[in-house]
């Protein structure tokens, strides 16, 4: 017959004969008690400080017993610090601290009294009741207790063990090693050295067991790895080194000090057939959990009466929640509309229109905390009927359970709960929850956390995230009690916690033969990139030789050959189609990078549309184009007068609004921040163009707008005796100034290299250089216009009107040497190169400077 097994906590609870209250149930009960004394805080504010105080209170009761003494000490200390309280600011930090401890001296004893009335107890109170019942329990204890593998006891646990030992009703077996047990400098043996001095250990009872295994030769390797996830990528190599002949991985453990590495670790161990995972998969790291976090953030904004939804608050929720086929289509259309119209802030009406029919649309509607809780419970129930994988099912089930628990816990109270409060309560449950895996503990590779290694020995151990701050945790206690107060009253500090971690580490290593310690050498956030001090201790204090291995991501550039794409028959067929519709912009694309031309014109790929939170240069240019087209479109075909342009100047605001409407952007997009600035700059550019033309007219120049956004098509251009291509495109503006026909191309960029010097040697390849792309476009536009009957035999000027230099007016192409006809030779040759089957598309690499 097997003996009855207890954890030490279970035994302490049994002796106390009290029902423990913890977590949310305790918080809500405590708040109700608090409001009987003070009515100055709502539940959300109370929950910001009470959970930390409650842990401190439990520590007072567990390790000192007299919480009143510590509370009075804290009050006295604050009064000393605040000796001049009536001389200064009544609301200063010290004043607030003093008032806090005054309240706690009244509140915590009152809370204890109220809990006792309900026969309830916190973890700390459980220890007090156990202490009271201990002697009677031990006296009537008729079995034999065996305590195995302990390291650090609370005072009550220690008294329980020692009392049973004194009455010869128990045995105790520790697990230690001479290396850290006999060396006073070793924090790992701190508690065990104290226990060795118990009077219960004498000639008739030995202190068992102290081994001498740590000093046995070991193969220890320390890996300095550049990156957190990168540590997991080293695992297959280490495992292949350990198991050269077989792959059952018997007697091998992988220990994760950072639970967030579990998904990446499982990916790296995909080839391992037998794997037992004793640590749970943290619920907070799964997609559904992330969606819930985003959802609560969204509802907090709605609770503050937000008039619209920020698109980036909506999209992650839609992306990460499980959905059916109908939902997928609705979301696809929703995203397409946002991208097409560049909707950054979505009105409630728009959201209703765009997501109408979504099965979980009600999650986005504004509702109070109680209604939202019921909505989430129903949502989780419905989701479980969808086709989802086992991990998702468990994830959703845990959330449903948590929502129901919170609803049941809140129901006895009449609290006005805010969304923020509901979020805190849910996080309390979810952050401590994990999805458990089913495995075979007696075979295969073991994957676990450090605390799960207690009482277990492995021949081969691999420890990941062996960083300072992870092992040990260091001075990261969340407490209201200063270090000196904790030391004064024998409460655990980070020093005791370091000792506990040190014991787990050294005890786990002492029986191993092959030890692999990996740490992340990159400093990021709370990670300093420093290896744990325990590794340094082994290096400096033990006889073991350690092999150090550095694994880093190389930052050296990889020399890659430019991409080359041959012109296959199918590509040549596409080029024949392209010949029927050649735009000047196509040649510009080819000049910049032939591969871009191939992707765009042969494969017909397009850049994906993305939502712009700040107006892009492309859309800024379109905004100005559209506004100018709207204004000048009213005066096409007439010789302009001063009042024509003055009237247009009064309509600039209207033109900008019409341009925004044509872009399908929301007016709200331009109401604040940099987008407001861009709108004002666009307005100023439009005004500057009008004013420039106005000055021309005032000086007696004859100006007529002939066309705007003039479409040119079916313009034949001979490239050799047997072949021709057809040009097409759009010209931003055609006007006549004092009898000269002007072709004007609007640009957001500055004009470059418009003065052309065609040398005899360069006539064939002038426009093969990217720097002449603007001039090439203008020459092609001039050719196209010269082929149209209504413009034949006209004197033509072509130029750029740059929005960046708007006050300079039109800057024309100028032939310093050579002429317009000469320029067309290189246009012809460039097209011939594109069509040449023997010339592949070769990537042109442009240097970038960061």
Predicted regions and their residues:
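Anion-coordinating catalytic cores for phosphoryl-, nucleotidyl-, and glycosidic chemistry
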Residues: 1-7, 12-21, 203-807, 814-850
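Acidic-histidine catalytic/liganding microenvironments
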Residues: 50, 167, 788
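Generic N-terminal initiation segments characterized by hydrophobic and/or small/turn-forming residues
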Residues: 40, 84, 92-95, 112-115, ...
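Conserved helicase NTPase motor core
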Residues: 85-190, 221-227, 459-460, 624, ...
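Basic/charged alpha-beta structural segments of nucleotide/phosphate-handling enzymes
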Residues: 2-140, 155, 332, 336-342, ...
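Low-complexity, compositionally biased segments
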Residues: 43-45, 54-94, 98-101, 178-180, ...
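Ligand-binding grooves and catalytic loops that recognize ribose/phosphate and carbohydrate rings
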Residues: 183-206, 294-297
């Amino acid at each position: 017959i097997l003996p009855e097994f207890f954890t030490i906590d279970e035994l302490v609870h049994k002796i106390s004969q009290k029902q423990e209250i913890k977590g949310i149930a305790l918080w809500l009960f405590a708040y109700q008690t608090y409001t009987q004394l003070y009515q100055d805080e709502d539940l959300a504010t109370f929950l910001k400080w009470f959970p930390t105080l409650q842990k401190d209170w439990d520590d007072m009761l567990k390790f000192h017993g007299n919480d009143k003494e510590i509370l009075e000490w804290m009050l006295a200390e604050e009064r000393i610090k605040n000796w001049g309280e009536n001389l200064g600011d009544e609301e200063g930090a010290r004043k607030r601290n003093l008032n806090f401890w005054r309240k706690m001296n009244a509140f915590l004893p009152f809370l204890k009294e109220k809990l006792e009335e309900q026969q309830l107890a916190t973890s700390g109170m459980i220890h007090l009741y156990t202490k009271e019942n201990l002697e009677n329990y031990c006296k009537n204890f008729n079995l034999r207790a065996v305590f195995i593998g302990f390291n650090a006891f609370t005072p009550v646990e220690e008294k329980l063990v020692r009392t049973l030992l004194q009455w010869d009703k128990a045995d105790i077996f520790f697990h230690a090693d001479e290396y850290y047990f006999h060396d006073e400098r070793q924090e790992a043996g701190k508690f065990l050295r104290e226990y060795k001095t118990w009077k219960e250990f004498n000639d008739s009872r030995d202190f068992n067991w102290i081994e001498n295994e740590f000093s046995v030769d070991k193969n220890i390797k320390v890996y300095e790895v550049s990156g957190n996830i990168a540590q997991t990528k080293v695992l297959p190599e280490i495992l292949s080194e350990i198991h050269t002949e077989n792959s059952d991985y018997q007697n091998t453990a992988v220990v994760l000090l950072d639970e967030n590495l579990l998904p990446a670790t499982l990916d790296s161990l995909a080839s391992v057939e037998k794997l037992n995972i004793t640590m749970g998969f943290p619920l907070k790291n799964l997609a559904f959990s992330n969606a819930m976090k985003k959802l609560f953030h969204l509802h907090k904004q709605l609770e503050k009466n937000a008039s619209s939804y920020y698109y980036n608050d909506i999209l992650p929720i839609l992306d990460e929640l499980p959905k059916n086929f109908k939902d997928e289509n609705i979301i696809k259309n929703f995203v397409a509309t946002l991208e097409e119209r560049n909707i950054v802030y979505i009105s409630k009406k728009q959201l209703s229109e765009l997501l109408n029919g979504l099965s979980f649309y009600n999650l986005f509607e504004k509702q109070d905390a109680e209604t939202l809780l019921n909505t989430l419970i129903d949502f989780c129930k419905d989701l479980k009927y969808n086709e989802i994988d086992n991990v998702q099912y468990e994830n959703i089930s845990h959330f449903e359970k948590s929502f129901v628990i919170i609803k049941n816990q809140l129901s006895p109270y009449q609290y006005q709960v805010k969304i923020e409060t509901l979020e805190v309560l849910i996080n309390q449950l979810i952050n401590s929850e994990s999805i458990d895996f089913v495995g075979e503990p007696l075979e295969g590779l073991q994957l676990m956390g450090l605390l799960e290694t207690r009482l277990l020995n492995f021949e081969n151990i691999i420890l990941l995230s062996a960083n300072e701050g992870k092992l040990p945790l260091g001075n990261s206690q969340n407490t209201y009690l200063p270090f000196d107060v904790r030391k004064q009253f024998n409460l655990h500090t980070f020093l005791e916690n370091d000792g506990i971690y040190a014991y787990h580490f050294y005890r786990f290593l002492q029986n191993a033969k092959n030890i692999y310690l990996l740490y992340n050498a990159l400093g990021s956030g709370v990670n300093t990139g420093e290896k744990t001090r325990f590794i340094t201790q082994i290096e400096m204090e033990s006889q073991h030789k350690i092999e150090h291995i550095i694994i880093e991501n190389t930052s050296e550039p990889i020399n890659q050959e430019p991409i080359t794409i041959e012109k296959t028959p199918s590509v040549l067929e596409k080029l024949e189609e392209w010949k029927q519709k050649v735009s000047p912009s196509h040649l510009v694309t080819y000049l910049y990078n032939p591969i871009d031309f191939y992707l765009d014109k042969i494969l017909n790929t397009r850049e994906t549309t993305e939502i712009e939170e700040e107006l892009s240069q492309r859309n800024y240019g379109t905004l100005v184009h559209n506004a100018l087209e709207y204004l000048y479109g009213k005066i096409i075909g007439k010789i302009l007068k001063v009042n024509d342009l003055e009237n247009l100047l009064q309509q600039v605001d209207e033109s900008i609004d019409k341009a925004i409407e044509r872009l399908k952007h929301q007016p709200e997009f331009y109401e604040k921040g940099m987008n407001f600035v861009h709108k004002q700059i666009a307005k100023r550019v439009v005004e500057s163009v009008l004013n420039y033309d106005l000055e021309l007219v005032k000086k007696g120049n004859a100006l007529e707008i002939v066309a705007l956004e003039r479409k040119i098509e079916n313009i034949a251009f001979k490239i050799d005796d047997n072949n021709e291509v057809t040009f097409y495109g759009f010209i931003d503006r055609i006007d006549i100034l004092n009898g000269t026909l002007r072709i004007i191309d609007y640009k957001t960029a500055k004009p470059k290299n418009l003065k052309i010097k065609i040398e005899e040697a360069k006539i064939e390849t002038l426009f093969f250089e990217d720097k002449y792309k603007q001039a090439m476009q203008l020459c092609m536009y001039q050719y196209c216009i010269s082929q149209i009957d209504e413009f034949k035999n006209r004197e033509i000027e072509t130029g750029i009107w740059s929005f960046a230099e708007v006050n300079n007016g039109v800057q024309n192409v100028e032939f310093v040497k050579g002429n317009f006809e000469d320029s067309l030779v290189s246009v012809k040759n460039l097209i011939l190169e594109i069509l040449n089957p023997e010339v592949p598309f070769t990537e042109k690499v442009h240097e970038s400077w960061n």
